[in-house]
Curated annotation (Swiss-Prot):
Subcellular location: Cytoplasm
Its job: Transfers an acetyl group from acetyl-CoA to L-homoserine, forming acetyl-L-homoserine.
Reactions catalysed according to its record: L-homoserine + acetyl-CoA = O-acetyl-L-homoserine + CoA
Family classification: Belongs to the MetA family.
Organism of this sequence: Cereibacter sphaeroides (strain ATCC 17025 / ATH 2.4.3)
GO molecular function: homoserine O-acetyltransferase activity; homoserine O-succinyltransferase activity
Record protein name field: Homoserine O-acetyltransferase
Catalytic activity, EC: 2.3.1.31
Site (Important for acyl-CoA specificity): 111
Any one GO biological process: L-methionine biosynthetic process from homoserine via O-succinyl-L-homoserine and cystathionine
Site (Important for substrate specificity): 192
Keyword Transferase in annotation: yes
Coiled coil location: none
Amino acid sequence: MPITLPATLPAFDVLTHEGVMVMTPERAARQDIRPLRIGLLNLMPKKIQTENQFARLIGATPLQIDFQLIRMTEHQTKNTAAEHMAAFYRPFQEVKHEKFDGLIITGAPIEHLDFSEVTYWDELCEVMDWTQTHVHSTFGVCWGGMAMIYHFHGVPKHMLAAKAFGCFRHRNVAPVSPYLRGFSDDFVIPVSRWTEMRQDEIDAAPGLRTLLASDEVGPCLVEDAGHRALYIFNHFEYDSDTLKQEYDRDIGNGKPINVPRNYYPDDDPTKPPLNRWRSHAHLLYGNWINEIYQSTPYDIQQIGR
């Protein structure tokens, strides 16, 4: 089954060209199927790139997906055209009375700030509390996952002495988890962050279970069954060239940055990078969507009751 997107959303043409099944809302309405309603609370500056990345992953599953784009109500983005935001995004205050089978809360490049210093922190706290009554399963990504684990459990983030940047080996530490069906024991995941969550502090918080971890960059994927949530601190959703774009940007701006580790062949930035995480990215998000499908109420209004 396809993902439902407006025909004018850039992701529609991108995914169609890649062979992902996409349909318009008008066509979806003619099918006698209840699609899974998945929201994307997009906090990233490059909105369109992030839309494409997550739509690609959840659109590759066998289920029909109704993909809804959500923004913070008062925060004004500076990197995406206002026309795009007006055409495709709805503010949280407009959707907060609706129910969702799943919600993805993305990262944001504001790691250097304390959570309380983020201009939209109060509304984001409202969003996170709202997920407990209006969303069946929530997936917090990178800063979004750190924000959720801090909000619900008080586990803090910590600044790193140097940016964790590159493709790092990770271990599958919970192979029986339904979210890790098909996962190898050892694989790489793109990492790009200045902060970390510490394993001992996660272990001390009741109800948290680490599923993926790295000897070099720490815990990666954490399950929070009590809040029906997953938190991932690294970037399975990244395109093949996302780390390259970040590296080239910082080099162009004269910022000190190391070559992303284990990313370019022979660690040579003149060579095209290789994508070694794509299959596991599809597995993780496909497993998440499948778990939602298996457990969400058929009547979406029953979510949270």
